[in-house]
Amino acid sequence: MRVYEALKWASSFLQENGRDENAGEIVLCHVLKTNRTGLLMNMREEITAEQETSFTEFIHKHVEGIPIQYMIGHEMFYGRSFFVNEEVLIPRPETEELIVGVLERIERHFGDEKLHVADIGTGSGAISITLALENKNLHVYTVDIAQESIEVAKENAKTLGAEVTFYHGDLLSPFYETGQKLDVVVSNPPYIPEEDWRGLSPVVKEHEPKRALVGGEDGLDFYRRFMEELPNVLQKKAIVAFEIGVGQGEDVKGLLQQAFPHAHVEVVFDINGKDRMVFAEIE
């Protein structure tokens, strides 16, 4: 079997079974230990019988519901490869837009000041590690309630050469317990309503950690808790940045305005035109 034949088969098989037809390309890159460019340049190359077997097994497992990223053990985020397993949420492209928004506002709000930044809900470390690598003026802390997630993120920080301080704890508790003040707080908290979670694709519901996805009956539980804790840990001049679920923009904006009446609060839409981020600039 040639490369192009393997891709053609996978695309058709995945489509027939309601999966993303592009997943075959990701899997074949992994099996052949190459990148997309290498794949495209060698479309007529023969793959070995062993590679073909491995490739078809991966594709069949994905059709059964296992996410590709957990099978191959990594996902690309902001141009870097992050190790992932079933203890952490798979990083999404939408969260890259959150990173862009945070970095832009830091530059506008603080210039090149040295800042204390916290990412709440570590997961794979995609947010905290990316911020630390993209802006060397940031002292980045990150907190997760699950030690298993922290271990994954620590491995990513070591592999990618990022300096991040890890805390095992619940939301902002490590900071108000120590009196540490923060200039920037970023979070992609669990925001899916309980009822919506029940209707998710089995690929997500049966494999990604529920604790990283569900935010109570209306999806807003964690944002409400943040509003109780943020005033205790923020500097007078600060930035708060949240990723949100579709349709939650005005609710989260309202919560932030209630907690910080003089802040400039903005709902930002993602590349698909959906409300996806809320930023508060506090003076």
From Swiss-Prot:
Which GO MF terms does the UniProt record name? nucleic acid binding; protein-(glutamine-N5) methyltransferase activity; protein-glutamine N-methyltransferase activity
According to UniProt, the name of this protein is Release factor glutamine methyltransferase
The organism is Bacillus anthracis
Keyword Transferase belongs to the record: yes
User: Which PANTHER family does the protein's record reference?
Assistant: HEMK METHYLTRANSFERASE, MTRF1L RELEASE FACTOR GLUTAMINE METHYLTRANSFERASE
Concerning its family, UniProt says: Belongs to the protein N5-glutamine methyltransferase family. PrmC subfamily.
Highest taxon listed in the record's lineage:
Bacteria
Record EC number: 2.1.1.297
Task: Please list every transmembrane segment annotated in the UniProt record, as residue ranges.
Answer: none
Q: Where is the signal peptide?
A: none
Which positions does UniProt annotate for S-adenosyl-L-methionine binding?
Answer: 121-125, 144, 188
Which UniProt key words apply to this protein?
Methyltransferase, S-adenosyl-L-methionine, Transferase
Q: Which GO terms describe its biological process?
A: methylation
Cross-referenced InterPro entries: DNA_methylase_N6_adenine_CS, HemK-like, N5-glutamine_MTase, PrmC_N, RF_methyltr_PrmC, SAM-dependent_MTases_sf, Small_mtfrase_dom
Q: Where does substrate bind?
A: 188-191
Reported function: Methylates the class 1 translation termination release factors RF1/PrfA and RF2/PrfB on the glutamine residue of the universally conserved GGQ motif.
Q: Which reaction does it catalyse?
A: L-glutaminyl-[peptide chain release factor] + S-adenosyl-L-methionine = N(5)-methyl-L-glutaminyl-[peptide chain release factor] + S-adenosyl-L-homocysteine + H(+)
Does Methyltransferase count among this protein's keywords?
A: yes
